[in-house]
């Protein structure tokens, strides 16, 4: 099982890598400028967070050209929405804070996770409109699209950072993503 983490210059990308490694996955933190051809043998990708949609390198190509499960974290979630025709805009709250997220749709990504969890998130930017072919999985009082997934492909996005200590059930979420990658 090989799941790579795409480094988008986010402060928590190394924690995603460590979480996957601790869960027994062969993983590597790779630059977002890595050619698509060098990622053809992975079983899944995590598109990490970062400061700017303008600095996501080849991530759009990864989303369009690779046929593997992917999860976008924060900026990765926003990029996924944008690439597939959704809208991203300023959130009502900048900076990081604890947010209560409600899971509104059953999905294997949230298997064994309570319907309401407290997570660590920034809402400087957020997904404002779902892309066509995606469905909303979670919401909060400050953001209507905290998590989403493609209706047919194993493409997921979450606004929060499951890899940080402040987020409840983050390890479980990554464990569930690993199971999705095994299928």
Swiss-Prot record:
Pfam families according to UniProt: GATase
Subunit: Heterodimer composed of a glutamine amidotransferase subunit (A) and a GMP-binding subunit (B).
UniProt organism field: Archaeoglobus fulgidus (strain ATCC 49558 / DSM 4304 / JCM 9628 / NBRC 100126 / VC-16)
GO cellular component terms given for this protein: cytosol
EC number: 6.3.5.2
Pathway membership, UniProt: Purine metabolism; GMP biosynthesis; GMP from XMP (L-Gln route): step 1/1
Keywords recorded for this protein, A-Z: ATP-binding, Glutamine amidotransferase, GMP biosynthesis, Ligase, Nucleotide-binding, Purine biosynthesis
Domain of life: Archaea
Enzyme class per UniProt: ligase
Catalytic reaction equation(s): XMP + L-glutamine + ATP + H2O = GMP + L-glutamate + AMP + diphosphate + 2 H(+)
Reported function: Catalyzes the synthesis of GMP from XMP.
Keyword Transcription attached: no
Domain Glutamine amidotransferase type-1: 2-183
Name recorded for this polypeptide: GMP synthase [glutamine-hydrolyzing] subunit A
Active site: 74 (nucleophile), 161, 163
Gene field: guaAA
One MF term in the entry's GO annotations: ATP binding
């Amino acid at each position: 099982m090989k799941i790579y983490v795409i480094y988008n210059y986010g402060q928590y990308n190394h924690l995603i890598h460590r979480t996957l490694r601790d869960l027994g996955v062969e993983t590597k933190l790779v630059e977002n400028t890595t050619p698509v051809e060098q990622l053809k043998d992975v079983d899944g990708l995590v598109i990490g967070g970062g400061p700017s949609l303008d600095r996501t390198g080849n991530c759009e190509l990864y989303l369009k050209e690779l046929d593997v499960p992917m999860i976008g974290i924060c900026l990765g979630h926003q990029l996924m929405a944008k690439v597939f025709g959704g809208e991203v805009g300023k959130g009502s709250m900048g900076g990081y804070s604890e947010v209560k997220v409600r899971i509104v749709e059953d999905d294997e990504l949230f298997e064994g996770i309570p319907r309401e969890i407290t997570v660590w998130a920034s809402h400087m930017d957020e997904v404002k409109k779902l892309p066509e072919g995606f469905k909303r999985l979670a919401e909060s009082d400050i953001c209507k699209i905290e998590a989403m997934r493609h209706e047919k492909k194993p493409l997921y996005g979450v606004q929060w950072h499951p890899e940080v200590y402040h987020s409840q059930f983050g390890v479980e979420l990554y464990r569930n993503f690993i199971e999705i990658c095994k299928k």
